[in-house]
Amino acid sequence: MAAITETIDISRSPADVFSYVTDPTHLPEWQESAVSVRRLGEAPLAVGSKVAVTRRLGRREFTSTMQVIELEAPRHWHVHGIDGPVRGDVQGTIEPLDDGERSRLTLSLDFEGHGIGKALVPLVVRPHVRKEMPKDERTLKGILESGAAG
């Protein structure tokens, strides 16, 4: 199946957008399904870094480990799920607009199902993400444009 892709323009510089979206501790602030995030290891986020992300889907919570595959500030990042029945694959790209005063953020999300995840991905996960992702991007835009981002 094709990745789910959403794009939004944000009135902040690519560096500001990149800094916020690639800090996994911010996920629960702008992603509706993200309950908590825990870094696995103490080092700064880099290629190879891992984080445990707990998400709520309906009334259930699931934790999966995501690993940073690519991290090219301030333009691109790629993280991939390495365990659990549903493994997300997230790629983000930031394009500068208006001489770098604004940014165009494109998020692309795909999934691999393992075991029960093979049934969950098409029946539950994809429909949920198709609804949530545009809302998440609007929330992110609001946080960044209000200056509330840490």
Question: What residue ranges belong to the model's regions?
Answer:
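Short, cysteine-centered beta-strand-loop-beta hairpins and adjacent loop/turn segments enriched
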Residues: L57-F62, G113-G117
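Short, surface-exposed coil-to-beta transition loops
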Residues: A3-T5, E61-T65, R87-Q91
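Residue-level preference for beta-strand/loop junctions
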Residues: A2, V47-S49, R60, V86, ...
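Short beta-strand segments that buttress and anchor functional surface loops
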Residues: S49-R56, W77-D83
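Beta-strand/loop substructures that line and gate deep hydrophobic ligand-binding cavities in soluble
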Residues: H78-K135, G142
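A short, structured loop/turn motif at beta-sheet edges
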Residues: P14-A15, E42-L45, I69-P74, T93-R104
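Hydrophobic ligand-binding cavity/cleft-lining segments
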Residues: M1-G41, A46, A148-G150
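Generic structural detector for well-ordered beta-strands
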Residues: T7-S11, R38, Q67, T93, ...
